[in-house]
Amino acid sequence: RRQRQMCIRDSYINVYVILNETTSWGKAGHTIAEEQFIIQTPATAAHASKSSGTITLAADKNWLRITADNFETVFNTDEARMILLRYHNSDIIYGHEGLTYNGYRYISNNKRDWKPTAFKVKDFSYQLAEDHSYVKVITKMEATIDNITVPYCVNYTIYANGTIDVDATFTTNDHFNLPRLALQMSLCQRLEQVEWYGRGPIENYWDRKDAAFLGIYSKTVSEMGENYGRPQSMGNRCDTRWLEMKDKAGSGIRFSGDVPFEFSALHYTDKDLFFARYGHDLGNFHRAETILNINAIQNGLGNASCGPGPLPQYLIQKNKEYNLKFRMEPIR
């Protein structure tokens, strides 16, 4: 197994039952059954980035620019959002669409009205370390979909070497009834190569993941989708230890977490998939950029296309705080 920096060292055994002779119903080598047994998932602790170099800040009433050697990021202070991330003069973020809340997921064939998300900035502040080795950026927001409001915070610790630790908190209340608590961002077109250590290679969800074994997998973003009779939110991967979004030369950005996370990487937003009526309509909605979602939690799928929903243990709970932590760092 390849070893990667910050990779959680899991131990597991894959067991396969395979035909050793051809029968009337299957050829030799056909897999009858398979199972993965998790032997060890050790607890890990976050490690601060050992960063050399110093950070320079420049601020205006509408933006905050953070620069260091071969690294630059910019925040729109009115929106409390990262709008630029650049490593070695190569952009990562597309269209100023940095991390922001996403609570939507469309997996129903029943047509409903689209409900846009309204954002309200509650606070934006920053603090530079005395030695200029890192800066903390603190944002507090509210996201409202229809009559449901979700307070959330996204805090960034940004180091001079380009490493960014993200710490997000989402709070639900009595009225909460959304399928997902996630951060979404748009990545530049060149970052088409996806590699991850987590469950795969097929899509998988909280209550539907046993058939997707833990392992290291790679696909293109275009290969991360599914062919459903009616387009819908798709392509989720659970229990992810690290995720790399790269160009053909192997440069890009790496996401990793001490606690495994879920992600999806598609050429469509949830809104695109909502309005695409049939599979052949997807070409009209295809985007050159990649829409990346990293989930704190999302509801399970359940087993009924209509009727009962997911079991209670696979639902986001009301009046609860959910946390999402991960690290972003450059790949060269």
Residue ranges of model-derived segments:
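Beta-strand/loop-rich accessory regions of lumenal/periplasmic or secreted enzymes
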Residues: F37-R332
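Contiguous N-terminal and early-domain "leader" segments and peripheral loops that mark the onset or edge
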Residues: R1-R2, G95
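Terminal connector regions
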Residues: R9-H47
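Short, small-residue-biased leader/transition segments that mark boundaries at the very start
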Residues: Q3-I8
